[in-house]
Amino acid sequence: NWTIQNVNIIFPQDEEYINYWFSAWNSFVVFNSPHSKTFSILREQYLLAIERLAMSPENWDAINNPFERLAEHLMLLYGRGQIEIDDPLLKKFWNSSPIRIRSHALRFIGGSLRSTKEIIPDKTLIRLKKIWEDRLRAAKSSPNQEESQEELEAFGWWFTSGKFNDAWAYKQLFQVLQTSGKIGDVVRVLEKIY
Protein backbone atom coordinates (compact mmCIF):
# COMPACT_ATOMS: atom_id res chain seq x y z
CA ASN A 1 0.00 0.00 0.00
CA TRP A 2 1.41 3.36 -1.06
CA THR A 3 0.35 5.15 2.14
CA ILE A 4 1.97 2.59 4.42
CA GLN A 5 5.19 2.71 2.40
CA ASN A 6 5.33 6.51 2.45
CA VAL A 7 3.97 7.41 5.88
CA ASN A 8 7.41 8.51 7.12
CA ILE A 9 7.88 10.71 4.07
CA ILE A 10 4.45 12.30 4.48
CA PHE A 11 5.04 12.72 8.24
CA PRO A 12 8.81 13.22 8.65
CA GLN A 13 9.77 12.70 12.28
CA ASP A 14 13.22 14.32 12.32
CA GLU A 15 13.22 17.56 14.27
CA GLU A 16 14.74 19.42 11.33
CA TYR A 17 11.51 18.69 9.40
CA ILE A 18 9.10 19.50 12.21
CA ASN A 19 7.36 22.22 10.18
CA TYR A 20 6.65 19.71 7.39
CA TRP A 21 5.33 17.24 9.94
CA PHE A 22 3.02 19.87 11.46
CA SER A 23 1.75 20.87 8.00
CA ALA A 24 0.89 17.29 7.07
CA TRP A 25 -0.47 16.35 10.50
CA ASN A 26 -2.54 19.50 11.00
CA SER A 27 -4.13 19.07 7.57
CA PHE A 28 -4.93 15.44 8.29
CA VAL A 29 -6.36 15.90 11.77
CA VAL A 30 -8.40 19.01 10.97
CA PHE A 31 -9.97 17.85 7.72
CA ASN A 32 -10.51 14.16 8.44
CA SER A 33 -12.40 12.08 10.94
CA PRO A 34 -10.67 9.09 12.51
CA HIS A 35 -11.15 5.77 10.73
CA SER A 36 -9.95 2.41 11.99
CA LYS A 37 -7.79 1.65 8.94
CA THR A 38 -6.19 5.08 8.91
CA PHE A 39 -5.69 4.95 12.66
CA SER A 40 -3.82 1.65 12.47
CA ILE A 41 -1.47 3.18 9.89
CA LEU A 42 -1.03 6.49 11.75
CA ARG A 43 -1.00 5.31 15.38
CA GLU A 44 2.65 6.37 15.76
CA GLN A 45 1.77 9.82 14.39
CA TYR A 46 -1.04 10.15 16.93
CA LEU A 47 1.48 9.44 19.68
CA LEU A 48 3.90 12.00 18.27
CA ALA A 49 1.08 14.55 18.04
CA ILE A 50 0.25 13.98 21.71
CA GLU A 51 3.91 14.47 22.61
CA ARG A 52 3.86 17.76 20.70
CA LEU A 53 0.71 19.09 22.40
CA ALA A 54 2.89 21.20 24.68
CA MET A 55 3.73 23.26 21.59
CA SER A 56 0.09 24.25 21.09
CA PRO A 57 -0.33 28.04 20.96
CA GLU A 58 -2.95 29.62 23.20
CA ASN A 59 -4.53 31.69 20.44
CA TRP A 60 -5.12 29.13 17.69
CA ASP A 61 -8.24 29.52 15.53
CA ALA A 62 -10.90 27.61 17.48
CA ILE A 63 -12.59 26.29 14.34
CA ASN A 64 -9.49 24.74 12.82
CA ASN A 65 -7.45 23.98 15.92
CA PRO A 66 -5.45 20.79 15.22
CA PHE A 67 -4.73 20.29 18.91
CA GLU A 68 -8.43 20.30 19.79
CA ARG A 69 -9.15 18.12 16.75
CA LEU A 70 -6.58 15.61 18.04
CA ALA A 71 -8.53 15.46 21.31
CA GLU A 72 -11.74 14.91 19.33
CA HIS A 73 -10.14 12.12 17.29
CA LEU A 74 -9.02 10.37 20.47
CA MET A 75 -12.46 10.67 22.08
CA LEU A 76 -14.13 9.28 18.94
CA LEU A 77 -11.66 6.39 18.77
CA TYR A 78 -12.30 5.64 22.43
CA GLY A 79 -16.08 5.92 22.12
CA ARG A 80 -16.08 3.52 19.16
CA GLY A 81 -14.00 0.98 21.07
CA GLN A 82 -10.91 1.34 18.90
CA ILE A 83 -8.75 2.27 21.88
CA GLU A 84 -9.24 1.42 25.54
CA ILE A 85 -9.08 3.63 28.60
CA ASP A 86 -5.65 2.22 29.52
CA ASP A 87 -4.24 2.62 26.00
CA PRO A 88 -0.84 4.37 26.05
CA LEU A 89 -2.24 7.05 23.72
CA LEU A 90 -4.99 8.03 26.15
CA LYS A 91 -2.72 7.76 29.18
CA LYS A 92 -0.18 10.07 27.55
CA PHE A 93 -2.94 12.42 26.40
CA TRP A 94 -4.48 12.79 29.87
CA ASN A 95 -1.10 13.04 31.61
CA SER A 96 0.64 15.52 29.33
CA SER A 97 -1.98 17.65 27.57
CA PRO A 98 -2.59 21.26 28.52
CA ILE A 99 -5.75 21.66 30.60
CA ARG A 100 -7.61 23.52 27.85
CA ILE A 101 -7.13 20.55 25.50
CA ARG A 102 -8.25 18.01 28.13
CA SER A 103 -11.29 20.17 28.90
CA HIS A 104 -12.07 20.43 25.22
CA ALA A 105 -12.00 16.62 24.92
CA LEU A 106 -14.64 16.25 27.63
CA ARG A 107 -16.76 19.14 26.32
CA PHE A 108 -16.60 17.57 22.87
CA ILE A 109 -18.09 14.34 24.21
CA GLY A 110 -20.84 16.25 26.02
CA GLY A 111 -21.64 18.41 23.00
CA SER A 112 -21.67 15.38 20.72
CA LEU A 113 -24.02 13.57 23.07
CA ARG A 114 -26.33 16.55 23.25
CA SER A 115 -26.50 17.01 19.48
CA THR A 116 -27.09 13.31 18.77
CA LYS A 117 -30.77 12.55 18.23
CA GLU A 118 -30.33 8.78 17.88
CA ILE A 119 -30.31 6.36 20.78
CA ILE A 120 -26.74 5.70 21.82
CA PRO A 121 -25.91 2.02 22.36
CA ASP A 122 -25.57 0.97 25.99
CA LYS A 123 -22.02 -0.30 25.42
CA THR A 124 -20.99 3.18 24.23
CA LEU A 125 -22.64 4.86 27.23
CA ILE A 126 -20.83 2.43 29.55
CA ARG A 127 -17.52 3.34 27.91
CA LEU A 128 -18.26 7.05 28.27
CA LYS A 129 -19.25 6.66 31.92
CA LYS A 130 -15.98 4.85 32.49
CA ILE A 131 -13.87 7.64 30.99
CA TRP A 132 -15.82 10.29 32.90
CA GLU A 133 -15.41 8.46 36.21
CA ASP A 134 -11.69 8.04 35.47
CA ARG A 135 -11.31 11.79 34.86
CA LEU A 136 -13.31 12.62 38.00
CA ARG A 137 -11.02 10.38 40.07
CA ALA A 138 -7.97 12.02 38.51
CA ALA A 139 -9.34 15.48 39.30
CA LYS A 140 -10.10 14.59 42.90
CA SER A 141 -6.54 13.37 43.45
CA SER A 142 -4.85 16.15 41.48
CA PRO A 143 -2.50 18.44 43.38
CA ASN A 144 -3.70 21.27 41.13
CA GLN A 145 -7.39 21.59 42.04
CA GLU A 146 -7.81 24.89 40.21
CA GLU A 147 -6.74 23.27 36.94
CA SER A 148 -8.97 20.26 37.58
CA GLN A 149 -12.00 22.55 37.94
CA GLU A 150 -11.81 23.48 34.27
CA GLU A 151 -11.83 19.84 33.23
CA LEU A 152 -14.73 18.96 35.54
CA GLU A 153 -16.88 21.87 34.33
CA ALA A 154 -17.33 19.93 31.08
CA PHE A 155 -19.76 17.59 32.83
CA GLY A 156 -22.47 20.20 32.39
CA TRP A 157 -22.69 19.25 28.71
CA TRP A 158 -22.82 15.54 29.59
CA PHE A 159 -25.56 16.20 32.16
CA THR A 160 -27.74 18.25 29.82
CA SER A 161 -27.43 15.70 27.01
CA GLY A 162 -30.08 13.56 28.69
CA LYS A 163 -28.32 10.41 27.48
CA PHE A 164 -27.50 8.99 30.92
CA ASN A 165 -29.88 7.64 33.54
CA ASP A 166 -30.80 10.25 36.12
CA ALA A 167 -29.30 8.39 39.10
CA TRP A 168 -25.84 8.30 37.52
CA ALA A 169 -26.07 11.82 36.05
CA TYR A 170 -27.17 13.48 39.31
CA LYS A 171 -24.54 11.59 41.30
CA GLN A 172 -21.81 12.84 38.95
CA LEU A 173 -23.21 16.38 39.02
CA PHE A 174 -23.15 16.35 42.81
CA GLN A 175 -19.56 15.08 42.85
CA VAL A 176 -18.44 17.72 40.34
CA LEU A 177 -20.03 20.52 42.36
CA GLN A 178 -18.61 19.11 45.58
CA THR A 179 -15.12 18.85 44.06
CA SER A 180 -14.90 22.02 41.97
CA GLY A 181 -17.88 24.19 42.86
CA LYS A 182 -18.44 24.98 39.16
CA ILE A 183 -20.31 23.46 36.24
CA GLY A 184 -20.34 24.31 32.55
CA ASP A 185 -23.51 24.92 30.55
CA VAL A 186 -24.99 26.17 33.81
CA VAL A 187 -28.22 27.61 32.34
CA ARG A 188 -29.20 24.30 30.75
CA VAL A 189 -28.13 22.42 33.88
CA LEU A 190 -30.48 24.59 35.96
CA GLU A 191 -33.28 24.15 33.41
CA LYS A 192 -32.87 20.37 33.57
CA ILE A 193 -32.90 20.36 37.37
CA TYR A 194 -35.93 22.63 37.65
Q: What is each PLM-predicted segment?
A:
Residues N1-Y194:
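Non-catalytic all-alpha helical scaffold/repeat segments
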